[in-house]
Amino acid sequence: MFAHSICAGGPLPWPDLPFRWDRSGTHQEVVVFTDTSLVEAVGRSDCFKVAWMLESPRATRREYRWLWRNASAFDRVLTFEQGLLEALPHAKFCPLGGCWIAPEDWKVHQKTRNLSVIASAKRDMPGQKLRHEVIRRHSSAIDAILGRGYREIAGKIEGLGDYRYSLAIENCRQNYYFSEKLIDCLLTGTVPIYWGCPSIGLFFDKEGIIAFEHPRDLGLVLEQIGPEDYERRLPAIQRNLDLAKRYVYPEAHVWESIRDLF
């Protein structure tokens, strides 16, 4: 799933963890099978088999259906999907999170601009479509419309560091599912105007997040944001920055969930 990078959650250096991924296939005590490689576990009896579901069910419907039918093929299932967690005794909660912000930029930056959005050109998932709809409806209220779908930037810090707020829209809306789209905002002291995980209050201070469900809800929100609102939220912004550091590396949660297998 993430052979193009060292870490599953983004282009960061490897964290201080007592393991590294080995893709050579020569070490087989514990083997982790991600979404699209689950079927490779069938017939294997030479290792502990771990299923790690990285994508949401909206993105990998076929893989989730297969796992529901074949969950017993694995010694452990790592997932954020609520149904699997409730149904499978060998399932463990493993949040996605992730981060595309360099560690030296994890701080509350001096904010000089109000609102940004970063969007690719993709329009497949519900949240991807919603990003473009929000931009179409509310472009006059957005200071910077960035990303490969609009104006490409060298790094996400360019679209977050200077901004009090940023529209952070997940690819889908699902309990326990949140990604770097949220984490990157929190790590830069930027208040996410957020569409995504309905249960986000279980993980972060909701005073530092402005959640919405439909583009029509945004008009009033965008009228009320600004320096005074941001200053009022600063204690929650700092709390969320500290909390977000727990979710930078998905591998940290993987390790906590499988360390007993070694």
What is the predicted role of each segment?
Residues 1-53, 58-144, 149, 156-166, ...:
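Pol beta-like nucleotidyltransferase catalytic core
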